[in-house]
């Protein structure tokens, strides 16, 4: 693509897209600003990287429209937009090579159950298994060795990577991506304790529902509901190695980083951000746009939208930082208390 073609492409998403410099040069691909070479495109979205305006060898740099690039316009070209980070994401999408996980049609070694509906252009890879009465939407790719049990419905344009297991009754929307090794719809962790110390398994009779445009990372596990549905709403992004327990409801466009553990019946609002290794006690609720720091332990509900939480047990950010500051001074406070105690004892002894 030429620089001018990239500019024209970005006008679908931004207005204006200002070109500073030549537009005829051919761009072969994207690169990091630190290592970009001639013929490559990069971006700067953070002020601390502005020094690379003079250091980079990139032929094209995408910057914020407020950045003054006049000193460098003779060395390379610039595209000025309102959000250079997102603009570069769109450029990456343009240059990204699609993965070929399976060819359209059903591979010879795939096993397809009875009453299965396959939409136009569906691809089912080698040794994949699709159970009875499943419905797979147009353009969806089922990679080799994926297992889809009975009565599963998958929408259009989805990608199911190798070794994914989708249990019976799961409902998946359009354009959903589920990465390798993930398990969707396994039994929730439900056991009734008995007087003798043993446990009776509670049948897990619900399902998992995953909304449009969600993405599930590798080796994530999302358990089916005891009754009703475990819900991963539209646009949710779940990182690798995340556990979502039975009957959780994750609100639209929430993002959950790796190794977070979400106990049963947790309800998260829209647009929440959950840091890596955060833990949730279960049967609690988070309001919209709640931010939970990495390794926080959330043990109760927080119903004020936009709250930032950190620490164990998790508390609002300012409160937790204040407590941490107090803890840092415990040593000196103890010394002061010990000194005062000695002085009081000495004063008492002198009176005697």
UniProtKB/Swiss-Prot annotation:
Catalytic function, reaction form: a UDP-3-O-[(3R)-3-hydroxyacyl]-alpha-D-glucosamine + a (3R)-hydroxyacyl-[ACP] = a UDP-2-N,3-O-bis[(3R)-3-hydroxyacyl]-alpha-D-glucosamine + holo-[ACP] + H(+)
| Gene3D superfamilies named in the record | Hexapeptide repeat proteins, MurE/MurF, N-terminal domain
Q: Which GO terms describe its molecular function?
A: N-acyltransferase activity
Q: What class of enzyme is it?
A: transferase
One Pfam family of this protein, by short name?
A: Hexapep
Q: What InterPro entries does its record include?
A: Hexapep, Hexapep_transf_CS, LpxD, Trimer_LpxA-like_sf, UDP_GlcNAc_AcTrfase_non-rep
- The superkingdom listed in its UniProt entry is Bacteria
Q: How does it assemble?
A: Homotrimer.
Q: Which HAMAP family match?
A: LpxD (MF_00523)
Name of this chain's protein: UDP-3-O-acylglucosamine N-acyltransferase
Species this chain originates from: Chlorobium luteolum (strain DSM 273 / BCRC 81028 / 2530)
């Amino acid at each position: 693509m030429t620089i001018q073609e990239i500019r024209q492409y970005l006008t679908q998403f931004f207005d204006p897209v200002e070109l500073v410099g030549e537009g005829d040069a051919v761009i072969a691909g994207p690169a990091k600003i630190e290592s970009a070479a001639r013929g490559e495109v990069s971006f700067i979205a953070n002020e601390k990287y502005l020094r690379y305006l003079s250091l980079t060898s990139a032929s094209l740099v995408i910057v914020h429209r407020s950045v003054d690039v006049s000193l460098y316009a003779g060395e390379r070209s610039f595209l000025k937009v309102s959000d250079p980070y997102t603009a570069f994401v769109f450029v990456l999408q343009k240059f990204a090579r699609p993965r070929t996980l399976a060819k359209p049609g059903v591979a010879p070694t795939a096993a397809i159950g009875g009453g299965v509906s396959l939409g136009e252009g569906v691809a089912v890879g080698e040794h994949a298994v699709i159970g009875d009465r499943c419905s797979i939407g147009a353009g969806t790719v089922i990679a080799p060795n994926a297992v889809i049990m009975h009565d599963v419905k998958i929408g259009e344009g989805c990608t199911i990577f190798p070794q994914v297991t989708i249990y019976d009754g799961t409902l998946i929307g359009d354009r959903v991506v589920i990465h390798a090794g993930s398990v969707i719809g396994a039994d929730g962790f439900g056991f009734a304790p008995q007087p003798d110390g043993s446990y009776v398994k509670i049948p897990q009779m619900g399902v998992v529902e995953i909304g449009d445009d969600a993405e599930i990372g590798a080796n994530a596990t999302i358990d089916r509901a005891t009754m009703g549905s475990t819900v991963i709403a539209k646009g949710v992004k779940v990182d690798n190695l995340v556990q979502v327990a039975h009957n959780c409801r994750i609100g639209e466009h929430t993002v959950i980083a790796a190794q977070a553990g979400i106990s049963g019946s947790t309800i998260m609002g829209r647009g929440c951000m959950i840091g890596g290794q955060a833990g949730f006690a279960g049967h609690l609720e988070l309001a919209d746009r709640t931010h939970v720091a990495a390794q926080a332990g959330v043990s109760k509900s927080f119903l004020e939208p936009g709250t930032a939480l950190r620490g164990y047990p998790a508390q609002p950010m300012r409160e937790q930082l204040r407590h941490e500051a107090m803890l840092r001074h415990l040593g000196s406070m103890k010394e002061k208390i010990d000194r005062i105690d000695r002085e009081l004892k000495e004063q008492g002894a002198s009176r005697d």
